[in-house]
UniProtKB/Swiss-Prot annotation:
This is Non-structural protein 6. GO terms for cellular component: host cell mitochondrion. It comes from Rotavirus A (isolate RVA/Human/United States/WI61/1983/G9P1A[8]). Keywords: Host cytoplasm, Host mitochondrion. Interacts with NSP2 and NSP5. Pfam families: Rota_NS6.
């Protein structure tokens, strides 16, 4: 359960990072 939550948080952070990079371009 904890591992699943960690992966979800990681995916959300990754998506936010990609969005930030995309907006900076």
């Amino acid at each position: 359960m904890n591992r699943l939550l960690q992966r979800q948080l990681f995916l959300e952070n990754l998506l936010v990072g990609v969005n930030s990079t995309f907006h900076q371009m």
